[in-house]
Amino acid sequence: FLDDKFDEYFIKGLFFRKMKQYERAEANYREALKIRHNSLTAKNGLAISLQRQDKYNREALNLARFTYNQQPTNPYFIVTYFKSLIRTNPDQTIILNQLIKDLRSSWDINKESFGDMLQAEYVFFIEHDFNRAISIYKDTLRKNPLYPVFISLHEICSIYQKRCGIGSGIASEIAKRYHFDVDNDDSF
């Protein structure tokens, strides 16, 4: 019975995350984790749900770090950990670079594109070079137009827009070029 309830909460968490109802996703992942405390996929789903609510906090970081430490070759866990770490502890450049390297050597068929995505975030957050980050995103999308890469670019453009008042048109232009629908979030 408990496994059935875990599955129910986990699937609802995934469903609500895909529907961009992140608070509901968070609540369902939390319920799933009450039943199966060490479920790596539920912990990762909860970390992503927190991130999507712009809650790049200690909880999201600890969840992401835990899942990564349990399965350091899992590309999904690498991405989640990287995204939390770079936003909360950007001084951890050795770890951040290792995560990019780990992702590029993972089993994922899109490891190069996702590695480039993390590299673009690194260039933006650590090197503070928006234009170079955008150039990396554009090159990556030209080779392999993956929606998660676009979502990452969209997030960076939104942050840059808030900081500097410019940059929002770039994501819109790329969305049109590759027929991406920002409302249809199909990323990690």
Model-derived segments and their meaning:
Residues 5, 14, 39, 48, 74, 83, 112-113, 121-122, ...:
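Residue-level recognition of tetratricopeptide repeat
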Residues 8, 42, 77, 115-116, ...:
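TPR alpha-solenoid repeat register
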Residues 14-17, 51-52, 86, 124-125:
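Position-specific recognition of the canonical hydrophobic site in helix A of tetratricopeptide repeat
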Residues 20, 54-55, 89, 127-128, ...:
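Residue-level detector of the short coil/turn that links helix A to helix B
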Residues 25, 60, 96-99, 133:
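Single-residue signature of alpha-solenoid repeat helices
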